Amino acid sequence: MTPPTRPLRLDGSGRTDRVMASLTGVVAVYRRLSGVSGRRRPPVLAVDRDLPLIVDDLRVEAEGVVSLRLVQERGEILPRWRPGAHVDLSPRPGLVRQYSLCGDPDDRSAYRVGVRLLGEGSTAVHALKKGARITARGPRNAFPFVASPAYLFIAGGIGITPILPMVRQAAASGADWQLVYTGRDRASMPFLEELSRFGERVWVRPDTEYGIPASGAELLEGAPENAPIYCCGPIPMIVGVRTDAALRPSGPVFFERFSTPPIVGGKPFQVRLARSGVTLDVPADRTTLDVLRETVPGIAYSCRQGFCGTCELPAVTGDRVRICVEREPVTFDL
């Protein structure tokens, strides 16, 4: 016998129990959102696909920030992606970094990324010229965008890149949404002109005009009740938003950080390199990746957060170790 699609009253009348029907709807929405909530990331599936691309255009978007338009040499259609996705870019052999796609998911003729000049990887990207060749892998998505009638977006600095496609999709869907965009000053904040068409839905909040946010609560003001929160930017901002969101009737917090998370409560340990017989000490406040890079030049890495897999190394046991986050004694097949 097929169960009823609506919960019935217990008095035998056969009529729908309106209270239980409402609760059933709430639970369904909760399950849909919590399945990809910021409390537990969905697995990031490996994408065994290298894309040889060409730099079709470069633009200066702000102080220290450029955007690249990347296309296939013969104009082939690129793989599909959804807001929140990123690609691994290799501007030169042995160097891999991750960058969020910030263009239009419906435009499969090109990918667009925004890159702030900070560190070795971004320096190599900024040095590229129009017509340069670059290898991409992906796209992959560790920051999934869920359907909802309302949203609050919070971006800090270059953290605007994964948020941009989400804002466009939210606007196109007719959702109720707000964006809080923070940064050092307007000159350093990319894509301001692009965002200006959304009017009062976007609060541009540079520190030079408003001061550094005192708490996450300040950035959460005016958020639609129970709306999902999407946050990308510096770690202190993300921590503040997640902490204060837990104290109010907000929806799930989805977040992505571009910097390495701090090591909290770490303990020192040792790793051994089987082929050379070298034993290395890993201090409580450093990663295996940091220590190995000083001894084994050329080790590939990218996200430094444990989900991209670029830094995986083989152990003599046959296991593969993500040396940016895993902290235990191990002997590597090196």
Task: Name each model feature, range by range.
Residues 1-47, 333:
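Iron-sulfur (Fe-S) cluster-binding modules
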Residues 3-14, 120-277, 281-284:
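FNR/FR-type flavoprotein reductase catalytic core
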Residues 39-133, 137-140, 146, 150-151, ...:
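Ferredoxin-reductase
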Residues 83-84, 263-270, 307-309:
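A short, compositionally biased
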Residues 87, 269-274, 311-315:
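Short polybasic amphipathic segments
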Residues 162, 293-330:
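Local cysteine-cluster metal-coordination motifs and their immediate loop/turn environment
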